[in-house]
Amino acid sequence: MELFDTHTHLESFARRGDLPAVLERARQAGVATMVTIGTGPDDWELYRGLAAEHAGDGFVRHTVGLHPCSVDSAWEAAVAGIEARWKLEPRPVALGECGLDRFHLPKEPEEAARIFGWQQAAFAAQLAIARRLDAPVVVHSRGAFAECVAMIDASGVDWRRVVFHCFTEGAAEIGELNRRGGVGSFTGILTYKTAEAVRAAALAQGLERFMLETDAPYLTPMPHRGKPNEPAFVRHTAEFAAGLFGVSPAELARVSTENARRFLGI
């Protein structure tokens, strides 16, 4: 069974000093490829280095982007460095994660409005870069689904190159993405007892567009919820999703891996 974790954050494991063990556990669990997701200039070169180390088998791929929670008054300098990363080898497989996040805004209204304005400007700038590069876009949307959709509509980005990672909206919202050509990808939240709306969204989108992710070290699937997440645990989400779609785990792994490779063009 060959699994593809489309969204993880390996920086946390590198900082902790246990990245080699985490990668080995992922291999043992059947993970053939993982994409470590850039959030800002501090992790871009680390991730390019990891992708270079694994260039032979493509086990680790990487993206470059400025996460909305990394946006501050200096966002323009960070975003200005993104496009040049596509001239380096190995090249990023997507731009992101980028988007909008209302959840982590400060409580003070004026400060929140100022930061959200920076997020919108940084997102628009990154969408423009993605359009120029014809790169896939990994979108972070939390408490700002309608705004993210509207900004992508206005950007001219090809919706077929857009994934809303860690999809937590419902069937109606994923329908908004799908009718435009975009997709959502799913984390261990899918396994949570209270996540009926997320499961409904996955079913509404269908197996033919389903992609898996861990978002490690966050959002650990059952039965390990409460512990730090890691790429190996994508297997638990895959097995749960197989039951949801009424297929074997091997078939779920095959289709979701094909979907991920097709979306990223690898």
Regions inferred by a protein language model and the residue ranges of each:
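Mid-domain alpha/beta scaffold segments of enzyme catalytic cores
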Residues: 1-266
